[in-house]
Amino acid sequence: MDRQKILIADDEPAIRLLVSRMLGEEYVILEAADGEEALDIAERQQPALILMDLMMPKVDGYAACLRIKADQVTKEIPVVMLTAIGHELNRRFAEEMGANGYITKPFTRKALLEEMRRLLPPA
């Protein structure tokens, strides 16, 4: 059985490492350190799901999500925002940009997997 690809886009290496360790046995992990890199990887690799930080250099998570959802190649990829910003206005704005989910840091492996399974097609 092929493992699904998950893109983790976060400018904090510690967050990318944490999520990679949480998910690495079940999924193939792709990593991006900024929004621009996330857009490039999303188009080239077409992951099954993207976990994206809101506040990143070059292109922030809002703009990256909007561009992913506007692109014919990537528009169907679910995007889950992983952010320390838990304010409801931010959540609604992320949804307006096309985000399919929103998880506030710190998060548990269980919460992350539940949200991913809600959005991912069966492998």
Question: What is each PLM-predicted segment?
Answer:
Residues 13-30:
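Two-component/phosphorelay signaling modules centered on CheY-like receiver
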Residues 27-33, 41, 103:
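Short hydrophobic/Thr-rich beta-strand motif most characteristic of the beta2 strand and flanking loop
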Residues 45-51:
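Active-site beta3 strand of CheY-like receiver
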Residues 56:
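Receiver (REC) domain active-site loop signature in two-component systems and cognate sites
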Residues 107-116:
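C-terminal output helix
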